[in-house]
Every structure is written in structure tokens, then in C-alpha cells.
Amino acid sequence: MDPKKIARINELAKKKKTEGLTSEEKVEQAKLREEYIEGYRRAVRHHIEGIKIVDEEGNDVTPEKLRQVQREKGLHGRSLDDPNS
């Protein structure tokens, strides 16, 4: 997210505590917060999709649902042609 937008979120939060927000500012704050949260969710999803889980013996124990996503995106050498990957 753009640092200016984050600064604006913080500015509105500070103003809300000190003097309150107008209805327009409340709408702006809600939109900015939603944009921030969506970006955060995307980053977490991207991070999780890049994880490969292995046990103590080195066996891949990544959950099947995550493996399917990785196959679709071609991550970790997983292939849609090989369901065992």
C-alpha cells in the first residue's frame, strides 16, 4: 500500500480520538482500512502458498488443498500433470 495512504489512515485515526470525524472522513477511513486489510490478506495468502511442509524424515506433508493451489501456480516444482507432486 502507498505510504501516503497509510499516513492518511493514521492521521484519521488520530483525529478520530481527538476531535472526531466528519461523515465524509468516516467513509474515507473505512475505504482506506478495507484497502489496507485486503493488501494484508493478499500478502499472507501469497506467503502461505509458498510454504512447503516436510516432516522429520524429509517427506512432503503439505496439505492437499495447498498442494493443489501450488500445482495451479507451478510452485515448488508441482505440476498439474503429476497429481503426486
Curated annotation (Swiss-Prot):
Pfam families: DUF896 (PF05979). It is found in: Cytoplasm. Its main location: cytoplasm. Residues 62-85 are annotated as: Disordered. Keywords: Cytoplasm. Coiled coil: none annotated. InterPro entries: DUF896. GO terms for cellular component: cytoplasm. Belongs to the UPF0291 family. This is UPF0291 protein SPCG_1462. It comes from Streptococcus pneumoniae (strain CGSP14).
